[in-house]
Amino acid sequence: MAESTETGGTAVNEPAGSQPIDDSEMPLAEHIEEMIKRLGIVLVAMGVVSGVVFPFADDIINFLWYSFLPGSPTVCPATADQASAACPYVYDPLSLVLARLKAASLAGFVVALPLFVYQTYRFMRPGLYPTERRYYLAAVPMSLVLALVGVGFAFFLILPVIFQYFLGYSKPVAEIAFALEDTFGLMTLLLGFFALVFQIPLFVMLAIMMGITTRAWLASKRLYFWGGFAGVAFLFSPDPTGMAPVIVAATMIGLFEGTLLLLRWTGRG
């Protein structure tokens, strides 16, 4: 005899005796305390990784900067003979420190993503069925893999296109003086954002495997998701020309639709 638990309009069938072992009522205050504890662990881990990486922040800045912009540390600041070098300029005393913090925080953020998934699992574990626990645990290493793939996607495909567009868009009008904080902030924002964006397939598959929703329901609401993705992309991609938000939104929609297509092809959900 199987027990069926309704979750989000779908049924999750579990054999008798496989119900959540640790499921018990907890006061709201204890739930909030547990949630804060789990988030605290994630933030502390992010801070520790950022602190370890901080001494190497200048190397990270130089590596990222000259991966997408012309020039090198040996020719900056630019002279008349190297006027084509896109050297970083500091316009206030805190700009360099803030850029270093952003470089270190990017590393901490990428490492913290799978830890966040794991701590979410620990928070929800008492109410999960054994099969749901297995799905969630399998998602932890996959989260790190997807985060690294997202960073790589942004590094090799998105950022080069965006900065080539910026350079070509501005050259006929003015000589660009690249502000370190703003320009490097855009780099780290997009790298970190794509690490997060590439979690979309994981979240979709987890939600379906755990019976929270179905592929058919997600497909029927796709236009709402597309609109949400576009809104988030334009909110977190500070580019008044619209180039970066369009690329980010297209990537999010592509990941969402690709996941639904894969689930349909495999017959899951």
Where are these regions (language model features)?
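Membrane topogenic/interface segments and analogous intrinsically disordered interaction regions
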Residues: M1-G269
